[in-house]
Amino acid sequence: HIQAIRGVPRTTLHSPPNHQGLYSIEESVQKMHLSLNAAFGFRVPVAIKCAASATSVSVYNNLLRDPYKICGGFFIDGIQGGTGAANEVSLDHTGHPVVSKLRDCYLAAVRQGLQGQIPLWAGGGIGMTGTAAADAFKMICLGANGVFLGKILIQLLGCVGNEQGRCNACSTGRCPTGICTQDPRLVHRLDVDRGAQNIVDYMLALDGELRKLMAPIGNSSLPVGRSDALVTTDRAVADKLGIQYVC
């Protein structure tokens, strides 16, 4: 079904895809410009999503210098992020932790006095161990303007895949719970209303917990970049992220 939509029948589609024809930041910006123009006359923002890697900071720096300032956000996805359409070897062994690359991007913007010009969003493993609010708080203190969730929301819809037993049927069209499929025999298995309510309840709980974490540091708004609110017992982590070391 996806092959037909993209006009490439009987072709293996890899995830994440490579963007053939884009070899420079200038070409990427041009693609964003064309996408923005196509998206209802520049009324819809277009953001960049980048895997956390050695080149993340370079990409972000180039976007900061874009004279047209058309990038609506920079999404960094860490190694703990997941997609059911990827090979397990890619899921387990490629990418960097989002924490360090997020911090590098934020500090790069600070050094240029451009923090906040392009909002930073962090994801990849947020809430994976049941601590979404705490994870979000740490990311925001390290410089993120917000976080994004993926796998955990799909699980709230009823996805049966998890870290202990991956389903990995997302790209096959045979999703057993009816989420990632167009097959009418499977779609009916998804209870949309119940799944939506699960997500609403989860996000409201996350919001409440995040407010409780912000209260002790005296913030009523998101503490973007307030690394002084964080400490670590690992000296290497303290040195890398520029936060306080305690023992």
Give the ranges of each region predicted by the language model.
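Compositionally biased, intrinsically disordered low-complexity regions
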Residues: 9, 180-184, 197, 244
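Glycine-centered secondary-structure boundary/capping sites
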Residues: 7, 95-96, 113, 143, ...
